[in-house]
Amino acid sequence: MTRAIVVTATDTDVGKTVFSAGLAGLLDGCYWKPVQAGLADGTDSDTVRRLSGLPDDRILPEAYRLETPASPHHAAAIDNVVIDPALLAPPPCDRRLVIEGAGGLLVPLAGGLLFADIFAGWRFETVVVARTALGTINHSLLTIEALRARDIPILGIAFIGDPQEESERTIAAIGGVRRLGRLPRLDPLDAGTLAAAFAAAFSPEDFAP
């Protein structure tokens, strides 16, 4: 049976791919992005390959690779591709598998099918990645509420950005979720700086099955 952690976020461009790379590296696991929309500027799998330190065979191929950089349902329509949820079964991996969603939890895949519906079917523990910037309390609590409404297990919330103790504490308290830690924005960002920062902010025990 696949032992997986799903990584979702409160919005796009939060830092979910960087977090996924750090987590996959910390766990010495595998990584999988079910649906990649947009290929010309590189893929999230390419980023994780560069930043995680994992061998290529542990960056598992996407179920769908869409040319158009857009929400998956729109990219699929433009590319004349039909996304079949039956093909979104997590691939086998003999290590912990980090699964990265697209954008936020309620991103549509096809018709009325949302990423949240796929996650609900899998029932893997899910990490919410959130900004620390203004507005994150509302976005984070809405995401937590949407996960709970679908009975998706929540492992905890991880923040990315400058420290905002009050916002981070408030989200964890009101949302009733574990506060896993905070990853700072990194400059330079490479495999070495990410591994060091991730190990300082999180431990493998935070993500134990």
Curated annotation (Swiss-Prot):
ATP binds at D13, V14, G15, K16, T17, V18, E100, G101, A102, G103, P184, R185, L186. The keyword Metal-binding applies. It is an enzyme of class 6 (ligase). It is found in: Cytoplasm. Keywords: ATP-binding, Biotin biosynthesis, Cytoplasm, Ligase, Magnesium, Metal-binding, Nucleotide-binding. This is ATP-dependent dethiobiotin synthetase BioD. Signal peptide: none annotated. It catalyses: (7R,8S)-7,8-diammoniononanoate + CO2 + ATP = (4R,5S)-dethiobiotin + ADP + phosphate + 3 H(+). It comes from Rhizorhabdus wittichii (strain DSM 6014 / CCUG 31198 / JCM 15750 / NBRC 105917 / EY 4224 / RW1) (Sphingomonas wittichii). The keyword Signal does not apply.
